Curated annotation (Swiss-Prot):
Organism listed in the record: Notechis scutatus scutatus
InterPro entries xrefs: Kunitz_BPTI, Kunitz_BPTI_sf, Prtase_inh_Kunz-CS, TFPI/VKTCI-like
Entries under SMART domains matching the protein: KU (SM00131)
Cystine bridges: 31-81, 40-64, 56-77
Record's signal peptide: 1-24
Entry's Gene Ontology cellular component terms: extracellular region
Domain BPTI/Kunitz inhibitor: 31-81
Function: Serine protease inhibitor.
UniProt KW keywords: Disulfide bond, Protease inhibitor, Secreted, Serine protease inhibitor, Signal
Protein name (Swiss-Prot/TrEMBL): Tigerin-4
Localization of this protein: Secreted
Listed Gene3D superfamilies: Pancreatic trypsin inhibitor Kunitz domain (4.10.410.10)
Length: 83
């Protein structure tokens, strides 16, 4: 297979991996944690996975501590937690 063909195959596999939803059994446990702004007083837009609504939602993060259910972008949240 040519290098162009290998690059195309690699690109398609990467795209498939990005677009394949996470099943609930593969979802990390931290996706079930509530949004946690932490004790600091920053005003940073962040996203968390809301397990009841099964969506990623925005919240205000204080900038320190909190928990692992905290993402800089909604796309990162969806890739990690959304089914």
């Amino acid at each position: 297979m040519s290098s162009g063909g290998l690059l195309l195959l690699l690109g398609l596999l990467t795209l498939w991996a990005e677009l394949t939803p996470v099943s609930s059994k593969d979802r990390p446990k931290f996706c079930e944690l509530p949004a946690d702004s932490g004790p600091c007083r920053g005003i940073l837009r962040a996203f968390y996975y809301h397990p009841v609504h099964r969506t990623c939602q925005m919240f205000i993060y204080g900038g320190c501590y909190g928990n692992a259910n905290n993402f800089k972008t909604i796309d990162e949240c969806k890739r990690t937690c959304a089914a």
